[in-house]
């Protein structure tokens, strides 16, 4: 991916040149920012004014178990300040810009050359929890797309559905579960969508828990009820069985006493 080029630098109009963020095309970002490869095989790079510390980013990547990372071949992750959607075009800002942030997206997957490059906006979130969760959600969905859903996990999750456990792990899983249990003509299709979504969700939450101490209540969203603690713990333990932790990481579930 190396080489020397002349970059077309664009300035965000509407702000003074001194205060404007510089934007570049994703292909330019790929060419001027060589990737590092973590011990688990994941390729990644940072570009621009990214506030997450380098050692935190390295550990975030290293938390992904080798069995998951091995499914992410020909994929590279770029942690950038802002990934900005400009109609059909995507540009990358070299730092936070309040005007550009209005059209920024959390991430964008783009095929560049023979690899899929994922550009993750770090300055829309600016805290380790949110940045890591965005990365791990992408990893979870990429694994499901390439390797499918574990039969052992699917059996567990569907047993929980049949037992009418409360809540789910994402809006996608919640909506698909409702359709899968409505006994309509497309119930089987929605069941498969539900299992794919819930498996990806469980992977992302598991990875987040390897990197940070995660409180159950930090996972709540307003759009759907969160899966109850006991079935959540069952799913995460199943993921830990399927994808054991890398050396230097631990997976534990602790229960706090109330009162």
Please name every model-derived segment.
Residues 37-128:
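Auxiliary, metal-adjacent structural segments of Zn-dependent hydrolase domains
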């Amino acid at each position: 991916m190396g080489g020397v080029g002349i970059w077309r630098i664009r300035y965000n109009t509407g702000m003074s040149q001194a205060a404007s963020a510089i934007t570049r095309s994703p292909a330019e970002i790929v060419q001027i920012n060589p990737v590092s490869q973590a011990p688990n095989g994941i390729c990644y790079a940072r570009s621009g004014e990214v506030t997450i510390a380098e050692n935190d980013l390295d550990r975030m990547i290293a938390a992904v178990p080798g069995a998951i990372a091995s499914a992410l071949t020909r994929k590279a992750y770029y942690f950038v300040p802002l990934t900005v959607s400009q109609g059909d075009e995507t540009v990358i800002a070299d730092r936070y810009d309040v005007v550009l942030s209005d059209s920024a997206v959390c991430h964008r997957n783009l095929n560049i050359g023979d690899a899929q490059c994922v550009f993750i906006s770090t300055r829309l979130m600016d805290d380790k929890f949110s940045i890591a969760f965005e990365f791990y959600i992408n990893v979870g969905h990429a694994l499901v797309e390439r390797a499918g859903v574990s039969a052992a996990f699917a059996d567990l999750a569907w047993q929980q559905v049949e037992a009418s456990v409360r809540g789910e792990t994402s809006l996608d899983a919640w909506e698909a579960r409702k359709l899968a249990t409505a006994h309509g003509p497309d119930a089987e299709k929605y069941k498969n969508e539900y299992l794919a979504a819930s498996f990806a969700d469980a992977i992302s939450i598991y990875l987040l828990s390897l990197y940070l101490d995660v409180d159950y209540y930090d996972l709540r969203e307003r759009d759907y009820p969160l899966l109850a603690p006991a079935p959540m713990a069952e799913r995460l333990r199943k993921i830990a069985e399927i994808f054991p932790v890398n050396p230097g990481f631990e997976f534990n579930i602790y229960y706090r006493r109330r009162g």
